[in-house]
Amino acid sequence: MSAKQGWEKKSTNIDIASRKGMNVNNLSEHLQNLISSDSELGSRLLSLLLVSSGNAEELISMINNGQDVSQFKKLREPRKGKVAATTAVVVKEEEAPVSTSNELDKIKQERRRKNTEASQRFRIRKKQKNFENMNKLQNLNTQINKLRDRIEQLNKENEFWKAKLNDINEIKSLKLLNDIKRRNMGR
């Protein structure tokens, strides 16, 4: 069964229910149940109701607040014996799926386009961040190599000065030893 046939079947069920004496309150409750269960029929009926009432904001706020839509001031309870009004709604409902599916396709395409653009921006930012990180890594490696060279240079200087100090200490200790020997011999 195609989507359009399913839609026609559901709208016919509502038409039959309204002929059997379903009042506005029951229809309103049924509509609220369809909308709250996120059914396709409920969303289409809501769209149709919003378009036909002209007071979409008030109607949406009533539905969101859980108020009974039948109490909506600008909606009128259909009079008994007026089947023509309900069949007119059914005809409009059958036309609605085509426009809604086109709108849904446009929305999906727009969403897909935005997601593609966002993904592209993300990939560009990721590449840029990787490039920046590689540059930072290269700079840090250069600094590390310079610091290692400096450490090596300082170690060599340290060894040189240690050797100098040892030489000076050795000369001083020999001199001191010779002074002690002379004093001891002179006695």
UniProtKB/Swiss-Prot annotation:
Query: In what residue span(s) does the bZIP domain sit?
Result: 105-168
The record's annotation in CDD domains points to:
bZIP_Zip1
Q: Which UniProt keywords apply?
A: Activator, Amino-acid biosynthesis, Cysteine biosynthesis, Cytoplasm, DNA-binding, Methionine biosynthesis, Nucleus, Transcription, Transcription regulation
Region annotated Basic motif, chain positions: 106-136
Q: What SMART domains would the database entry show?
A: BRLZ (SM00338)
Biological-process GO terms, alphabetical: cysteine biosynthetic process; methionine biosynthetic process; positive regulation of transcription by RNA polymerase II; regulation of sulfur amino acid metabolic process; regulation of sulfur metabolic process; regulation of transcription by RNA polymerase II
Q: Where is this region: Leucine-zipper?
A: 137-151
Induction data: Expression requires MET4, and is repressed by an increase of intracellular S-adenosylmethionine (AdoMet).
Q: Which residues form a coiled coil?
A: none
The keyword Nucleus belongs to this UniProt entry's keyword annotation: yes
Q: One cellular component GO annotation, for this chain's record?
A: transcription regulator complex
Main location per the UniProt record:
cytoplasm
Indicate yes or no for the key word Cytoplasm.
yes
Taken from the record, one Pfam family name reads: bZIP_2
GO molecular-function annotation terms? DNA-binding transcription activator activity, RNA polymerase II-specific; RNA polymerase II transcription regulatory region sequence-specific DNA binding; RNA polymerase II-specific DNA-binding transcription factor binding
**PANTHER family (UniProt xref):** ACTIVATING TRANSCRIPTION FACTOR ATF 4/5, TRANSCRIPTIONAL ACTIVATOR OF SULFUR METABOLISM MET28
Q: Give the quaternary structure.
A: Interacts with MET4 to form a heteromeric complex which also includes CBF1. Forms two alternate complexes associating MET28 with MET4 and either MET31 or MET32. Binds to DNA through the MET4-MET28-CBF1 complex.
* Similarity remark: Belongs to the bZIP family.
Q: What is this protein called?
A: Transcriptional activator of sulfur metabolism MET28
State the organism named in the record.
Answer: Saccharomyces cerevisiae (strain ATCC 204508 / S288c) (Baker's yeast)
Q: Write the lineage as a comma-separated list.
A: Eukaryota, Fungi, Dikarya, Ascomycota, Saccharomycotina
The gene it comes from is MET28
